[in-house]
Curated annotation (Swiss-Prot):
Chain residues that bind ATP: G122, T123, H124, G125, K126, T127, T128
Molecular functions per Gene Ontology: ATP binding; UDP-N-acetylmuramate-L-alanine ligase activity
Keyword Cell wall biogenesis/degradation appears in the UniProt entry: yes
InterPro entries linked: Mur-like_cat_sf, Mur_ligase_C, Mur_ligase_C_dom_sf, Mur_ligase_cen, Mur_ligase_N, MurCDEF_pg_biosynth, UDP-N-AcMur_Ala_ligase_MurC
UniProt catalytic activity: UDP-N-acetyl-alpha-D-muramate + L-alanine + ATP = UDP-N-acetyl-alpha-D-muramoyl-L-alanine + ADP + phosphate + H(+)
Natural source organism: Mycolicibacterium paratuberculosis (strain ATCC BAA-968 / K-10)
Designated name of the protein: UDP-N-acetylmuramate--L-alanine ligase
Biological processes, Gene Ontology terms: cell division; cell wall organization; peptidoglycan biosynthetic process; regulation of cell shape
Amino acid sequence: MTTDQLPAELERVHMVGIGGAGMSGIARILLDRGGLVSGSDAKESRGIHALRARGAQIRIGHDASSLDLLPGGPTAVITTHAAIPKTNPELVEARRRGIPVILRPAVLAKLMDGRTTLMVTGTHGKTTTTSMLIVALQHCGRDPSFAVGGEMGEAGTNAHHGSGDCFVAEADESDGSLLEYTPDVAVVTNIETDHLDFYGSADAYVAVFDAFVERLAPGGALVVCVDDPGAAALARRTAELGIRVLRYGSGSHGQAPSGQPLAATLVSWQQQGTEAVAQIRLAGEQQHPLVMRLSVPGRHMALNAMGALLAAIEIGAPTEAVLDGLAGFEGVRRRFELVGTAGGPAPSSTVRVFDDYAHHPTEIAATLAAVRTLLEQSGGGRSIAVFQPHLYSRTKAFAEEFGRALDAADEVFVLDVYGAREQPLAGVSGASVAEHVSVPVRYLPDFSAAAEQVAAAAAPGDVIVTMGAGDVTLLGPEIVTALRVRANRGAPGALR
């Protein structure tokens, strides 16, 4: 039975770092369910303006007095340990007053109580797969509540309190917080070593997925992509525990190449510009393969959609309605998002600029593969990759792998490391990645000069893609502007 009534401790909350993707989503749901919300963050943002419009009291900067923004003060203070230090003055003041400090994952778990819970995790593709599942269920009339790590194109938001009986959310594995949840359906897209700054070893990272699956509710199911070796191994271990496993991936006659049975098989896939058409077969279906159309390119997107399809079917959504919903999925901000174009109307006379959140070698490889197919279908041109490494620890661990992945581009620009929460490491910079790139590459430590240099390298028909989890997303519009300026003044290079 669902209820809109909030737990008493969440009726009046103060959120430290309220503008973050995950925190702002929690704030939206709390406000929609009648809660009072105050918060603070380091800087203004579009998300903060939207929360203020909904009634949240938000202060820029961190100060102990922010705990008095709500009449009577908060019943709890919510934070995220990944980005907010324990020395934050608002957290210090909360502890002094005896106000409970609750981490975001624990709050999300409380908000899910009483609903059928579907959670998506994995090293790559979490946000996109979660968003696909949400859109599919919305199309089926289920109106799910949801919390996702990116802004969905259709909804223009990252969270929603729905009237339906299910809750869809992204489960973040980066800090072990996915162990707060007890899902009815868990989707695992892939497992590949990451976040060694937190886990310390590959074995510890892999183990958290096993622990997550073991938290499935009685009668729950694991939906897992067995094209990925790490996820396929998880499927085998999970089946040995007696948990129901629904596998999806490439194969024939209902089996993956490994011999594992498939609940959904990717029979064929074809990219058509920035769209894709896949043929899939569901277990037990004897008729011709089903056609799955997507408005987002890349074989990896087809696999993500298959995971969403199986999860939706698992809770009773009609197959054809789910496929119709997936066909209307417009993507997520920063997932192969078209930023802009400069030049003529034909692909051969224009430069297209995309932005992508890719910040792991495998993600970069998938994004550049989609770019390559796009170029092949539009008559040629070059791919230009602009990559900003994220975190010093990740850059140190994967510098060589980043270089190999970037070799799929025709030309590469590497920016300096976006450190986020980390302090610099001696000898680690964007140059650490650039030295492992074998195609033409330039290391650009000066972010402010990057847009002009990238624009100068482009020619009609080229595709530029900015990649990374930091502020490289700001660069795309600057590149588009620089391209247009160069074209207007007849500068050599881009659009002569």
